Curated annotation (Swiss-Prot):
This is Flagellin E. One of its GO terms (cellular component) is bacterial-type flagellum. GO terms for molecular function: structural molecule activity. V.cholerae is able to differentially regulate the flagellins within the flagellum maybe to produce flagella which are particularly suited for motility within a given environment. Flagellin is the subunit protein which polymerizes to form the filaments of bacterial flagella. FlaE is not essential for flagellar synthesis and motility. InterPro entries: Flagellin, Flagellin_C, Flagellin_C_sub2, Flagellin_hook_IN_motif, Flagellin_N. Heteromer of multiple flagellin subunits including FlaA, FlaB, FlaC, FlaD and FlaE. It comes from Vibrio cholerae serotype O1 (strain ATCC 39315 / El Tor Inaba N16961). Keywords: Bacterial flagellum, Coiled coil, Secreted. It is found in: Secreted; Bacterial flagellum. Gene3D superfamilies: 3.30.70.2120, f41 fragment of flagellin, N-terminal domain (1.20.1330.10), Flagellar export chaperone, C-terminal domain (6.10.10.10). The keyword Coiled coil applies.
Length: 378
């Protein structure tokens, strides 16, 4: 090997290896101190892109979980208030049944009506004051809300909260009363037993209820017979002996029409639309109608509570799935981005040794030109 002065090849080689060892050592120290295998695009350009996409998705999943929990909180708040609404309606039904009893005097029915009015006020107060973060839930203002329970656009679920005020149309129905008064001698006679009730249901389809009354039944027995034949229409008798019929507003898109020989005799007329808000149990007939109206209201409230319960379960399952996806994505991202400490520690020790060796070799290589000077002197 030639001995030169201008170019110290050995020193250059040693310096290159020293620089490489130093660079690799710095990389290992950076990974060990940060905990990340990828700290910049130069470490792994493709891996950095994949890792960033995974982290974006994981952040979205975290927000989706929080959104779903907010939805559950809203539903729990609303459902808790509706539980009290149910209790109030049940108490109002008890009062209606009590007032319908013939043992009550007019004064006692007035007292019962006063409690009914107080309960109605409380029912409306609950509907007006139940709120979540300042947003009213049960007075009809909430309507629909969209809850983003996914990490991407389009992964939203609609939540509806219904109006729980006592004047809501869903909490009532149409009442009818016969013009004819049935005295103690009144009976269903032969040839006058047919009562046909026709209406258009909420889906726009024609419905027809046919009642073939039993000959010899009095007006109370006729009402009982009608109730046994259909669950769409409820029948009762007021204190004057008039037949009363009621159908929930949600069952029909219009009013009832009556035909048949018995209908001609009874002469059924529309009394009006009754809701919980305008119930009057100061008479036996009003109390009987109130029971039917409150039954409609209870079905309405309980039905919506069931919907909210099902939606809460749906949100809980959505959260479980989001957590599971987040867990798997975090594991995937860790495999791509996180540093392997066993590997990096080994690499660090290796590069430290190489750095020390390269430093020693470089020092020796730099002494080689001195041998040329030694030759010249001798």
């Amino acid at each position: 090997m030639a001995m030169t002065v201008n170019t110290n090849v050995s020193a250059l080689v040693a310096q290159r290896h020293l620089n490489s060892a130093s660079e690799m050592l710095n990389q290992s120290l950076e990974r060990l101190s940060s905990g990340n295998r990828i700290n910049s695009a130069k470490d792994d350009a493709a891996g950095l892109q994949i890792s960033n996409r995974l982290e974006t998705q994981m952040r979205g999943l975290g927000i989706a979980v929080r959104n779903a929990n907010d939805g559950i909180s809203i539903m729990q708040t609303a459902e808790g208030a509706m539980q009290e609404t149910t209790q109030l309606l049940q108490r109002m039904r008890d009062l209606s049944l009590q007032s319908a009893n013939g043992s009550n005097s007019a004064a006692e029915r007035v007292a019962l009506q006063e409690e009914m009015a107080a309960l109605n006020d409380e029912l409306n107060r609950i509907a007006e004051t139940t709120s979540f973060a300042g947003r009213k839930l049960l007075n009809g203002q909430f309507m629909k809300a969209s809850f983003q329970i996914g990490a991407s656009s389009g992964e939203a679920v609609q939540l509806s909260l219904r109006n729980m005020r006592s004047d809501s149309l869903e909490m009532g129905g149409f009442s009818y009363v016969a013009a004819a008064l049935a005295d103690k001698q009144w009976q269903v006679t032969k040839g006058k037993q047919q009562l046909n009730i026709s209406y258009v249901n909420a889906q726009g389809e024609n419905e027809n209820i046919q009642i073939q009354a039993k000959e010899g039944d009095d007006i109370e027995e006729l009402a009982t017979y009608i109730n046994g034949k259909t669950d769409k229409v409820s029948a009762s008798v007021n204190e004057k002996g008039q037949l009363q019929l009621y159908i929930a507003g949600k069952e029909t898109s219009g009013t009832l029409s009556f035909s048949g020989s018995l209908a001609n005799e009874l002469q059924m007329n529309l009394l009006g639309y009754e809701a919980v808000d305008n119930l009057d149990i100061s008479s036996a007939g009003g109390a009987q109608r109130a029971v039917s109206v409150i039954d409609t209201a209870l079905k309405y409230v309980d039905g919506h509570r069931s919907e909210l319960g099902a939606m809460q379960n749906r949100f809980q399952h959505a959260i479980s799935n989001l957590d599971n996806v987040h867990e798997n994505l975090a594991a995937s991202n860790s495999r791509i981005k996180d540093a392997d400490y066993a590997k990096e520690t080994t690499q660090m020790i290796k590069q430290q040794i190489l750095q020390q060796v390269s430093t020693s070799v470089l020092a020796q290589a730099k002494r080689q030109p001195k041998f040329v000077l030694f030759l010249l002197r001798n």
